[in-house]
Curated annotation (Swiss-Prot):
Transmembrane segments: none annotated. Keywords: Acetylation, Cytoplasm, Heme, Iron, Metal-binding, Muscle protein, Oxidoreductase, Oxygen transport, Transport. It comes from Hemitriakis japanica (Japanese topeshark). One of its GO terms (biological process) is removal of superoxide radicals. Heme b binds at residue 89. It catalyses: Fe(III)-heme b-[protein] + nitric oxide + H2O = Fe(II)-heme b-[protein] + nitrite + 2 H(+); H2O2 + AH2 = A + 2 H2O. GO terms for cellular component: extracellular exosome; sarcoplasm. Pfam families: Globin. This is Myoglobin. Disulfide bonds: none annotated. Its EC number is 1.7.-.-, 1.11.1.-. The gene is mb.
Length: 149
């Protein structure tokens, strides 16, 4: 089970630098999974160097991290924001659910690098548990929608 209080205590620091953290997460996602760029039309077909400081990646980074933050702040009682997030990613963006696991795993790594004192082993375990819980709930929504992407 996730330690939501631990996650939220670190998340308050994340919010102070949310766009830069989101940029690092997205850039790492594109570096590790280049095919993931296909799901971000404004960002695809650009090198990581070209993307680094564009307004488009900053806007997308802000959107992604704020959506994740809204779910994290629910401390596990997140069915409504998860349903809304899944619905848009199923119908509009058509992003396969395994990308949520990829991006949240990357997020734990990036946060650990950027906030080494806050992201000790206990915090990393708390984030991993919280993100696993969130991703599992998102996958349930995909299954319920019979996603075929």
């Amino acid at each position: 089970m996730a330690b939501w209080d631990k996650v939220n205590s670190v998340w308050s620091a994340v919010e102070q630098n949310i766009t830069a953290i989101g940029q690092n997460i997205l850039l790492r996602l594109f570096e590790q999974y280049p095919e993931s760029e296909d799901y971000f039309p404004k960002l695809k077909n650009k090198s990581l160097g070209e993307l680094k400081d564009t307004a488009d990646i900053k806007a997308q980074a802000d959107t992604v991290l704020r959506a994740l933050g809204n779910i994290v702040k629910k401390k596990g009682d997140h069915s409504q924001p998860v349903k809304a997030l899944a619905a848009t990613h199923i119908t509009t963006h058509k992003i396969p659910p395994h990308y949520f696991t990829k991006i949240t795993t990357i997020a734990v790594g990036v946060l650990s690098e950027m906030y080494p004192s806050e992201m000790n082993a206990q915090a990393q375990a708390a984030f991993s548990g919280a993100f696993k819980n969130i991703c599992s709930d998102i996958e349930k929504e995909y299954k319920a929608a019979n996603f075929q992407g």
